[in-house]
Amino acid sequence: MSEHNPAGAPGASTEVRVAIVGVGNCASSLVQGIEYYQNADDTSTVPGLMHVRFGPYHVRDVKFVAAFDVDAKKVGVDLSDAIFTSENNTIKIADVPPTNVVVQRGPTLDGIGKYYTDTIELSDVPPVDVVQALTEAKTDVLVSYLPVGSEEADKFYAQCAINARVAFVNALPVFIASDPVWAKKFADARVPIVGDDIKSQVGATITHRVMAKLFEDRGVQLDRTMQLNVGGNMDFLNMLERERVQSKKISKTQAVTSNVHREFNTKDIHIGPSDHVGWLDDRKWAYVRLEGRGFGDVPLNLEYKLEVWDSPNSAGVIIDAVRAAKIAKDRGIGGPVIPASSYLMKSPPQQLPDEIARAQLEEFIIDTK
């Protein structure tokens, strides 16, 4: 990492000015959550937050300054209304007052798959100059919430972040922070990136990862495992297009296998999205099974089902990723922010055991070197 200045040094702002790409359910939960936790007591443990105050930044210090989408029902609309329109169907946790942030038309590129095309109407407004929009909004952090499979679009916005000198949080499974070429681009530009592919607070990936490690730590040979996921949001509808989902399967699989020493045959591990069930709305149901052998090679099997609201589950992690990116920007750090990426993302540049990644993140928060 490059040399840096301590957070809170002269020139570091008291706000975290955030722009969002993709005003879907995840963006909705994040925007609502900032409102929900405005008055959270930073001297107490607050349900739903790992850190009320992350370094110098309270949750309420996050301010939304720009948003980009391609949906005709969202472009030209105040962010506070856009998060509740079109196909967004996550649970409502807060009323959001007008933000005075109007959703702008971003470029489409490969951001819309065939199921999106059949479901939403694309805005006929010409795309804006994203770099100029980020600069004019004095953006600190750009969060990419593009649909799974948006390889070209995600890299376009990553380059915009570099050009605008804006920190980048890559919430989807397009490999940017974990790609050495892209990592060097961010490092050379002294622009921080936290990525790739956001973990949930307690989701299928983190629970599966922990249980696989538990088997290993307790001397149980994990022979085979699977994770099947169904949900009712646009993310799951989009992932019915299997050509768009390969990076997601890779990301979820390596998040589990990287936490154990065992090498799996391809047929012995299956992890990925399975189907779209419309009436689930933004809920996700995960079915996980681990099959192993314990003492005397006696079979030992574990099967569980996890039910979550998908988008709030990720918002509880992205709120820390955003503030970590801002601290890195304050300190002049360029390139992947390893402590935040390793703990908060499924496919970071460096996979670490969760307890080590968490300890490094806490050290990063208080680091004043």
UniProtKB/Swiss-Prot annotation:
It comes from the Bacteria. GO terms for biological process: inositol biosynthetic process; phospholipid biosynthetic process. Transmembrane segments: none annotated. InterPro entries: MIPS, Myo-inos-1-P_Synthase, Myo-inos-1-P_Synthase_actino, Myo-inos-1-P_Synthase_GAPDH, NAD(P)-bd_dom_sf. GO terms for molecular function: inositol-3-phosphate synthase activity. Pfam families: Inos-1-P_synth (PF01658). Belongs to the myo-inositol 1-phosphate synthase family. NCBIfam families: mycothiol_INO1. This is Uncharacterized protein ML0396/ML2692.
